[in-house]
A protein has these predicted regions:
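Karyopherin-beta/Importin-beta family HEAT-repeat alpha-solenoid scaffold
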Residues: 1-149
């Protein structure tokens, strides 16, 4: 995938359109990487997809909804490394930046993006410095200091 992204960037815009037909085959690489929980390779593949989406987001138009659906499943999969999940979110954000019209037309893009962003914001990982302390703390909203007399 990296090789295709590098090659794609090296050719002129007019020639790039000839390679749009390869996108379905390229996207077919992603599901097996996710199914085998191969986070490192999935992370690299998603970064290559981000590069391609920055260069020519319109080439993804025919399969955009499928790509959104796949990316959402990656973001939701807590068995994958955080980096892979974040790269899937970055891919979706790249489309919003590069081709907002395409995102607007997709029936699930906006609601799923908002939901997944909020979900990722609430994830507390094992390696978070304050996670253990935060989980053990009392609810401050019940503390009398926070109530007005």
């Amino acid at each position: 995938m990296d090789a295709f992204a590098s090659f794609f960037h090296s050719i002129n815009k007019k020639s790039q359109q000839k390679y749009y037909a390869l996108i379905p085959d390229i996207l077919n690489i992603l599901p097996p990487l996710k199914e085998t929980s191969n986070s490192d390779d999935l992370t690299k593949a998603l970064l290559a997809m981000v590069d391609l989406a920055e260069a020519a987001p319109k080439m993804f138009r025919p399969l955009f909804h499928d790509l959104v659906t796949f990316s959402i499943t990656v973001i939701q999969d807590k068995e994958l490394d955080d980096q892979a999940r974040q790269n899937a979110l970055e891919l979706m954000a790249t489309f919003a930046d590069q081709n907002p019209q395409m995102c607007r037309k997709d029936p699930s893009y906006t609601s799923e993006m908002v939901t997944q962003c909020l979900s990722l914001m609430t994830d507390v990982g094992i390696d978070d410095d304050d996670a253990e302390e935060w989980n053990a703390s009392e609810d401050v909203s019940r503390d009398p200091l926070y109530f007005a007399s």
